[in-house]
Regions:
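N-terminal anchoring/stem segment of glycosyltransferases
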Residues: 1-91
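A short linear-motif detector with a strong N-terminal bias
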Residues: 37-39, 87-88, 95-98, 117-120
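Amphipathic coiled-coil/heptad-repeat helices and related helical stalk/stem segments
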Residues: 44, 102-105, 125
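Short, conserved acidic/polar surface loops in the N-terminal third of protein domains
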Residues: 70-74, 96, 128-129
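Short phosphate-binding loop-to-helix
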Residues: 95-111
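GT-A fold catalytic core of metal-dependent nucleotide-sugar glycosyltransferases
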Residues: 107-130
């Protein structure tokens, strides 16, 4: 079964306004360009590679900023398919990315027409799922 990762970067650029647990490390990144911590890249790699090894294809939904960032590290090669158009289009909407920071993910999930497994990028499946 196909799995999906989603990386919508628009909330990163509103990081000073993000509310909720887990955002302190993001707020402390001083970069004005999109960035992730090293451990985030590593768990993304582990998640995609383990899914492919044990369960099948994996697709990434991201935007142009996320695709450029992942390309720098060779991460796009981990995916069987990469879609930047969907989230590029969604990023043009008036949604408040700081308040609705998971909405890019939810829109991608609602966009699916076939069975799939959604994986947060820090979810690592190390066996075949039944």
């Amino acid at each position: 079964m196909k799995a999906i990762h989603v990386n919508w970067t628009k909330p990163f650029f509103e990081k000073h306004r993000l509310r909720g647990h887990g955002f302190e490390t993001l707020k402390n990144l001083n970069s004005k360009t999109y960035d992730q911590l090293d451990y985030q890249l590593l768990y993304t790699m582990a998640s995609a590679a383990n899914w492919k090894k044990h369960n099948g294809p994996i697709k990434l939904y991201t935007d142009s900023v996320g695709a450029s960032f992942y390309q720098r590290f060779g991460l796009l090669d981990l995916y069987d398919e990469v879609d930047i158009n969907f989230l590029n289009g969604y990023s043009k909407s008036n949604v408040d990315a700081a308040y609705f920071w998971t909405s890019g993910k939810i829109k991608c999930l609602a966009h699916q027409t076939e069975p799939f497994v959604f994986l947060d990028q820090d979810m690592i499946i190390r066996n075949k799922i039944p």
